[in-house]
Amino acid sequence: MEVLHKPVLLRESVEFLTENGGKIYVDCTLGGGGHAKEILKKRKDIFLIGIDRDEEAIEIAKENLKEFEGRFSIYKANFKDLDLVLKEEGIDKVDGFLFDLGVSMYQLKGERGFTFQEDQPLDMRMDKEQTLTACKVVNNYPERELIRILKEYGEEKFAVRIAKAIVQRRKKKPIETTGELVDVILSVVPEYYKHGKIHPATRTFQAIRIEVNKELESLKEALEKTPYHFNSKGRLVVITFHSLEDRIVKHFIKEKEKEGIFRIITKKPVTPSEEEIRENPASRSAKLRVAEKI
């Protein structure tokens, strides 16, 4: 699949990660290898461990990192299992973990239901081997559970209306494509909501994607494991794309600072420049936070 994915805050994240002069880094969201490539270019003695749940992205990354053969290992895994990956690699301590959260262009451009711009099967799985899909969430979850997900993970103010409409529609026939789900959403949200800054389906799609992939649980679990695997001055670098992720990261690094485990490097999150947002509108909501192991 020839899709060019533009890594967000690339220069800033790689600089923060590698400026400690370390030798072993973990890219917990390898994707197509955009960040990994820049990390490996930094110094010839760097070894990189890449983790991703997405088989297609891994194949693209292998191709993109060919010139660094022998200087990286790639694992198909959920980043919450980073401790198991390190054990398998025979490494206990590393100099940095990078997390670039959210959906990659490879997933948005594939026929996997991550986008509402095209009519695709309702899937949304980052790991195609897992059984829970967006279709199952939309057609099988009880109304109260749909409301909870839309409120909690989508921060959707019309969660009740949308959930009720989904339940009504699926009684007639299952909702099987992204287009059908968008139609349901558009049928119940007020007119003004259709002309806002973001598409009225954005929050619903985000909420369902987070539920399908258990994104927030995985993030919390992964972050909690990182302090046990840092060398001194190891860096934690995290790029988030919505307030739910950012809150989790902010809370985690503040807690670890209180416990005397981390020093916070970015007092305020780093955000993309106007130029980057112009070139890559998908970067507009990105926030970068960095902490260092004491």
UniProtKB/Swiss-Prot annotation:
Keywords of the record: Cytoplasm, Methyltransferase, rRNA processing, S-adenosyl-L-methionine, Transferase
GO cellular component: cytoplasm
EC number: 2.1.1.199
UniProt xrefs under InterPro entries: RsmH (IPR002903), SAM-dep_MeTrfase_MraW_recog (IPR023397), SAM-dependent_MTases_sf (IPR029063)
Residues binding S-adenosyl-L-methionine: G33, G34, H35, D52, F79, D100, Q107
Catalytic activity: cytidine(1402) in 16S rRNA + S-adenosyl-L-methionine = N(4)-methylcytidine(1402) in 16S rRNA + S-adenosyl-L-homocysteine + H(+)
Source organism superkingdom: Bacteria
GO biological process, alphabetically ordered: rRNA base methylation
Gene3D superfamilies: Putative methyltransferase TM0872, insert domain, Vaccinia Virus protein VP39
NCBIfam families: 16S rRNA (cytosine(1402)-N(4))-methyltransferase RsmH (TIGR00006)
Annotated function: Specifically methylates the N4 position of cytidine in position 1402 (C1402) of 16S rRNA.
Family that this chain belongs to: Belongs to the methyltransferase superfamily. RsmH family.
Protein name: Ribosomal RNA small subunit methyltransferase H
Organism: Aquifex aeolicus (strain VF5)
Source species taxonomy: Bacteria, Pseudomonadati, Aquificota, Aquificia, Aquificales
Gene for this chain: rsmH
